[in-house]
Amino acid sequence: MSWQGSDPGRSRVRLRATLQGLLLGWISVATAAGGAPDSGAAVGPVPEALRTALKLDPFYQKHLDVEGLPVVGSAKVSDHALAEAAWILRGMLPGRGDLLRAMAKNKVRLVVMAFNEYTTDVPEHRRLNSKVFWDRRARGVGGTPQDPVVSCGEENLLGYPGDPYSTESILIHEFAHSIHKNGLRTVDPGFDERLRAAYDNAKARGLWPKTYAITEPGEYWAEGVQSWFDANRENDALHCHVNTRAEVKEYDPKLAKLCAEVFGDHPWRWRKPADRPASERAHLAGFDPARSPRFRWRESPRRCASSGPSG
């Protein structure tokens, strides 16, 4: 008697193969048109093929594509925030469609949170422990191979009043983590060894003292990438004076070399939308900063619940 058709293990393998096929099919369709690195695209509903391939929660209602890599958000998220996120990814990785496609194949997606959504509103982040901590502190998560979801807040993308991280790009930092863990480990298996060597060299030389960058190799990389794109803070409790590409090159040449290997040394730099020329805001047509809402930590429902009723 044949038992193969009822074997749960084989059924799971077939299901995974089917979902992987759907995902690869979606990537092929999404990237077939090609286009310039800075080309824009319209925000639309989440394609059903993508929703099925990634098992996306109904929470996700909006979608934009970058070389097959999905940028998604709920119905609350501003279309301009999704467009800005896609614009930043293209600015970071011109000519690196191989990296974006590898990340897409590894099921990476970028989630933009609305200004009044919080970290554990994101379906894939709901299982995080200490929900109040995450909702009170984090406006972005970098993703891992086991949980390949990168997130950031629309207030940081568009420069809303009340943005608690207004002098840096959270997206660039968190996406750098995913580039490392979900992209470079696929397309450049030797990268981790070079990163560890650069990090060990920095520690031996006493670089980045008492900063977030020196805590471990992953943060060393993500902080370095932020500064490579002039998108970091400086001279505070977690940072030294280095927050630009020129300063990274001078201060830590080995880290600069890694950044140049991955991103190139092209002129694109991050700037807040309000500080850019009109030519770099075409994808934000119709966005009026004067009408932006204000971000407030206190509006997290889990934080409010933990505080109890006010007297």
Question: What spans do the regions from the language model cover?
Answer:
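N-terminal low-structure segments adjacent to metalloprotease catalytic domains
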Residues: 32-129, 265-311
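Alpha-helical and His/Cys-centered functional microenvironments
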Residues: 8, 24, 177
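Acidic/His-rich structured neighborhood in mature extracellular/periplasmic domains
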Residues: 59, 68-69, 77-200, 238-241
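Metalloprotease/metallohydrolase-associated module, dominated by Zn2+-dependent proteases
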Residues: 47, 55, 72, 128-155, ...
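Bacterial N-terminal signal peptides
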Residues: 18-30
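N-terminal secretory signal peptides that target proteins for export/translocation
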Residues: 1-15
